[in-house]
Amino acid sequence: MTTANQPICPSPAKWPSPAKLNLFLYITGQRADGYHQLQTLFQFLDYGDQLTIEPRDDNQIRLLTPIAGVENEQNLIVRAAKMLQKHPGNTPVPRGADISIDKCLPMGGGLGGGSSNAATVLVALNLLWQCGLTDEQLADLGLTLGADVPVFVRGHAAFAEGIGEKLQPAEPVEKWYLVIHPGVNIPTPIIFSDPELKRNTPIRPLAALLSTPYANDCEPIARKRFREVEQALSWLLEYAPSRLTGTGACVFAEFDTESSARQVLSIAPEWLHGFVARGVNVSPLHRVRSGKKLKAVSADNDLQRYVRSK
């Protein structure tokens, strides 16, 4: 069992909230409650949102940077903080926080932004409030917020089954990726409710999955229903192996070197917005928690400008 780390507060209280990619994603069934069962391989990126979290000596949870179109009380950031605040294992002392977010990841992009935000709040406030919960306990809390939250809490690349909550640590090759947002957001229910979605891919052992070309069962639906996704993938596939992440809308191409990825980004059409990042098997959030410094990532890129303009 993972034990809770000693409090280490990044200065000045800034916490990474990294993106993830689904390197492959197969839908193997659907439960009676409507949730889809899957097999997927998660890997983090050294790129994402950034949260600034300042503890308060009262019970107020304040999100200082509201996200357009999302009520604060429904935001996973606030919900995660309040859930931890009310955890029965916590001592009854005033705990609050002021939280702001530098939003770089698009909503409805398949990069896990909301789930990552929730996980960062749980991990950071567990330390700042000195709750002493283990990663397993935090992951269990996170699962009630979303199926992808536990992998961000645990902080290691993983092979996932079930609805995404059954995690097995994995070590995929840490390649470079060009991630493209095609200018459309895709709510997950649109893909999962499509009657043509393939829901019966045979369950296979991890070794078999790793030895065959990767694919995403959601990709045909996204390409069919969203012209922008079809166009983005068609363009990317001219340069490198490419596919959808999650339920979209972002697509990605893999490269062996950063320079190769940046060269393709430099010739992308104006209607595509993207960034280059390294795939990493240890989450930047957990590297910060353990006191390690992160490699500086460009504070400004095309996708950040696009997201901030919305």
UniProtKB/Swiss-Prot annotation:
Q: Which InterPro entries match?
A: GHMP_kinase_C_dom, GHMP_kinase_C_sf, GHMP_kinase_N_dom, IspE, Ribosomal_Su5_D2-typ_SF, Ribsml_uS5_D2-typ_fold_subgr
Q: Give the GO biological process terms.
A: isopentenyl diphosphate biosynthetic process, methylerythritol 4-phosphate pathway; terpenoid biosynthetic process
Keywords of this protein's UniProt record, alphabetized? ATP-binding, Isoprene biosynthesis, Kinase, Nucleotide-binding, Transferase
Chain positions recorded as ATP binding sites: 106-116
Q: Which GO terms describe its molecular function?
A: 4-(cytidine 5'-diphospho)-2-C-methyl-D-erythritol kinase activity; ATP binding
Its UniProt entry gives the catalysed reaction(s) as:
4-CDP-2-C-methyl-D-erythritol + ATP = 4-CDP-2-C-methyl-D-erythritol 2-phosphate + ADP + H(+)
Among Pfam families, the record links this protein to: GHMP_kinases_C (PF08544), GHMP_kinases_N (PF00288)
Positions annotated as active site in the UniProt record: 20, 148
Q: Gene3D superfamilies from the xrefs?
A: 3.30.230.10, GHMP kinase, C-terminal domain
Q: Spell out the SUPFAM superfamilies in the cross-references.
A: GHMP Kinase, C-terminal domain (SSF55060), Ribosomal protein S5 domain 2-like (SSF54211)
Its annotated pathway reads: Isoprenoid biosynthesis; isopentenyl diphosphate biosynthesis via DXP pathway; isopentenyl diphosphate from 1-deoxy-D-xylulose 5-phosphate: step 3/6
Broadest EC class? transferase
Give the family from UniProt.
Belongs to the GHMP kinase family. IspE subfamily.
Subunit-structure text: Homodimer.
State what this protein does: Catalyzes the phosphorylation of the position 2 hydroxy group of 4-diphosphocytidyl-2C-methyl-D-erythritol.
Q: Which HAMAP family match?
A: IspE
Name of protein: 4-diphosphocytidyl-2-C-methyl-D-erythritol kinase
Species, as recorded = Yersinia pseudotuberculosis serotype O:3 (strain YPIII)
Q: Please name the taxonomic classification of the source.
A: Bacteria, Pseudomonadati, Pseudomonadota, Gammaproteobacteria, Enterobacterales
Q: Which gene encodes it?
A: ispE
